[in-house]
Amino acid sequence: MVLSSTNVATRIRLGALILLSIRLGYSAELKPETLTAWDDYIAQETAQVKQRATLDKGFLWTDAQPNRYNDIRNGGTVVEPMGEYNPLRVEGGLIHHWISAVFIPNAHIDDVLAITRDYAHYKDFYKPGVADASTISKSDAKDEFTIRFVNPSVLSKSSLQGNYVSNFYRLGTNRFYSTSVTTSMCEIKNFGCPNEKRLSQDQGSGYIWRLYSTARMEERDGGVLLEMEAIALSRGIPAALRWFVDPVVRRVSRESIEKSLNDTATAVHARLDACEAQNPHQIIGAGNCSQHAGNSDLRAKRLAGDAGR
């Protein structure tokens, strides 16, 4: 959800973003004009992401206002909607765009990437929203992976299976950004039941049709400042229900991206603690904890233990 791998944190929670409390009883159709509006929006966003990467000042959204960094540096998580209208109504759908930032003390960029690229343990890091995740292919600059996340609504036994491509860019020694986009998104009806059925892409409820995210990181002040920017395309909301559904969507959007970022920070700290316990005389830093075998399983067990307390 930062949207790429790091973004996946946000991507995952965006599965809970649309109509969590309401089950609309009919399917939604993804229209060509809806997809065109989405493609245009993402093209503009991609251009802005690339422009930010060239800036010495202005790379991070956080630095645009001094109070943001002060709040984040003091342990807060800042979450804000992007754009004048959020969600943005387009023909046949809605575009949801949010950004969030958090400071992870005593960490390096590689420590964060060790979590956000560890897809096999997403179900531990980001539960209960993630049912499963796995790597399709992996390289220094690009990952392909799949995530199945569940709709936590008690009114609907549904799941979404998404395939993603993330691209990674290092900017010197202390900056990094990544982008992530869905290559396919399929709804799974009757999730976990004997009659479970995977629908074709763009069929079903239309809770989530497309996802795009960006993650930006900078090492400073003894830690990592992590930003996640997440964008989702969903079905439109019938006019008769907007008065009730719109506030729910905005509230859940804010809570979801905030939880994603906090889950990532928690997983990073658990990883560092586990590495230190395993290697008490080693100076941990710059991601070198990941060089020790077994740390993924160890930190997954640590997270499971923390959740059970």
Model features per residue range: what roles?
Residues 1, 22-30:
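Charged, low-complexity surface segments at secondary-structure and domain boundaries
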Residues 1-10:
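N-terminal secretory signal peptides that target proteins for export/translocation
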Residues 5-6, 22, 291, 297:
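Compositionally biased regions
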Residues 5-6, 17, 41:
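Generic hydrophobic-segment detector
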Residues 8, 24-25, 308:
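Intrinsic disorder/low-complexity segments in short proteins, especially the signal peptide
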Residues 11-23:
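Bacterial N-terminal signal peptides
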Residues 28-309:
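Eukaryotic helix-grip
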